[in-house]
Amino acid sequence: MNEVLAKGIKAKEVARELVLKTTDQKNEALAAIANQLIVETAYILEENKRDIEEGKEKGFSDSLLDRLLLNEQRIVDMTEGIKQLIELRDPIGECVSAWERPNGLSIQEMRVPLGVVGMIYEARPNVTVDAATICLKTGNAVILRGSSSAIHSNKAIVSVIHRALKQTSLPSESVQLIEDTTRDSAKQLFTLNEYLDVLIPRGGKQLIDTVVREASVPVLETGAGNCHIFIDETADKQMAFNIIINAKTQRPSVCNAIETIVLHENWAEQYGSELFSSLKERGVELRGDNKAVAIDTSILLATEEDWETEFLSLTLAVKVVATVEEAIHHINTYGSMHSEAIITENEENVSKFFTSVDAAALYHNASTRFTDGSEFGFGAEIGISTQKLHVRGPMGLPALTSTKYVIRGNGQIRS
């Protein structure tokens, strides 16, 4: 029996145990994991160092190495996230709605775990902790399949989680890692319908598109972040500068960083040159259309591919438009339905933008960097969904649940 199938069978078995665990039991397990991560920090960092060294040998970009890197502070941040997760209300067992029918039947809609969650992701070893702990909090078994670039880190983290769970009432197999990082193991996970209730891809556009195209199991799509900010002609100059610099340069390798700015031509004529200089001073490489290049001849001429690309680095595309309608058309054509923003003092244009732009999160006069479970007040998140079914936007605890109906009667039969 191959690894993926064996772990699928075990996960299904464990899921039936997890549904019986109380909130206190689950929280005790989470606390044990947080403690064990601190106790074994040196071991985790030693294994992470192996991934970093191998990544450098393979010529990984600085942005990819940053996503791969763990240090003491990042592990502390993981444990703080787990502590916050413990404090969140457990959604399992809550009554979503209840009513009584004229025939006396009492109907309740109850929140329940999804069952077995598959998680396939790239680079970031912190996702291993996030996915494992969020699934445990919601009573789900989880099968993790990270990338080869983070295999040493992921194996170390999961072994630490197993040692923590063995101190609690939760089965250690509640969290399992597929150690085979070949394409074959991924394909097997895509079709594990008998054992997997949902598969969540988290990574770049190529990974997500592959999962959506090839998986026969249900998929919760966490889309790539080809995010835009439109600077309307009435936008406040300093506000626009602050928001764009934050949304691009604070952490360019994340999915809610912007990849394109769309400038109204009247605003660009006044402030474009200064904005471009400010961005270049911060190491940003600009690629613009003809109108942008006319403002600053040092800007590279953008290609069609640039409008479509999630750079995840200090590269930014620039589009200059004549109207809000033209901006909306560009964003809807090239955006990934993740996070889009408008900076303007014109409420009519805000209304047009919010009504017409198709994305999970829309902003007025704020950075797209806020599309995040903790920033939304959800606490933990397992990803940001860009699809429309089941859940959209940051996926907090309720996103990893389903519902079932519980009907109580006193002998009713249907006539």
From Swiss-Prot:
Catalyzed reaction equations: L-glutamate 5-semialdehyde + phosphate + NADP(+) = L-glutamyl 5-phosphate + NADPH + H(+)
MF terms (GO), sorted A to Z: glutamate-5-semialdehyde dehydrogenase activity; NADP binding
Recorded superkingdom: Bacteria
Pfam families in the record: Aldedh
An example Gene Ontology biological process: L-proline biosynthetic process
Annotated GO CC locations: cytoplasm
Key word Nuclease present: no
UniProt keywords, alphabetically: Amino-acid biosynthesis, Cytoplasm, NADP, Oxidoreductase, Proline biosynthesis
Location (main, coarse): cytoplasm
InterPro entries on file: Ald_DH/histidinol_DH (IPR016161), Ald_DH_C (IPR016163), Ald_DH_N (IPR016162), Aldehyde_DH_dom (IPR015590), G-glutamylP_reductase_CS (IPR020593), Glu-5-SA_DH (IPR012134), GPR_dom (IPR000965)
Broadest EC class assigned to this enzyme: oxidoreductase
Family: Belongs to the gamma-glutamyl phosphate reductase family.
Role played: Catalyzes the NADPH-dependent reduction of L-glutamate 5-phosphate into L-glutamate 5-semialdehyde and phosphate. The product spontaneously undergoes cyclization to form 1-pyrroline-5-carboxylate.
Stored NCBIfam families: PRK00197.1 (NF001221), proA (TIGR00407)
Protein name: Gamma-glutamyl phosphate reductase
Provenance organism: Bacillus cereus (strain G9842)
Gene name per UniProt: proA
